[in-house]
Each structure stands twice: as C-alpha cells, then as structure tokens.
C-alpha cells in the first residue's frame, strides 16, 4: 500500500471522517464512518465523479465547521486534472475553499480542501 501524508490537510480537530471512492492501493490510515460526519474525503477517478462528490456532500448533514476534500491523481493526460475538476465547483456557491486549499499529499496525489456552506 502507498502511504499518504494527511497532516497537510489540517484535520486534527475533526473526529468523524468518511472516505469515498478511494482506491485500495492507497492507505489513508483513517477509520471511515457514516456517523456524525464532519469531513468527506472523495477520490476523483473520472470527471463524472465530480457530480457524485457534490451529491454526496450536499446530501450529507455536515456541521457548520466541516471539510469536503477532493483527491485526484497528479499528471494525468486523460482530461482529469485540477482545472477540469474544479471548473464545476467554482460555479457552485455551496462550497468555499479552506486552508490549505490545494496541496500535495503524496508523490502521486493532490488534494483540494473545501467546506460545504451550511
């Protein structure tokens, strides 16, 4: 399994994290839960996953202080990249960027940190 540095995502104050659509080859070292979710970490494998991410976040009763995190593979040449992923989200007023916004969490993965406006 490939390890990931989640410290950059600044999730220390959150206890309940739900992980969705993540490849088994990566070890997040987090116990995923569906109870009282405060953070959703969602892996984007194809562009259609952006809509699924939005649906997962908007249908979840997240608290006011929350994080919604998109993770995607770096250096892809198939059209799934930062700009194509964030295009729809820039227009969606239900989300706002949160620190650290965009960061590398491994040699292969990048993450964008947002919050759902509640």
Spans of features found by a protein language model:
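Charge-dense, helix-prone N-terminal extensions
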Residues: 1-118
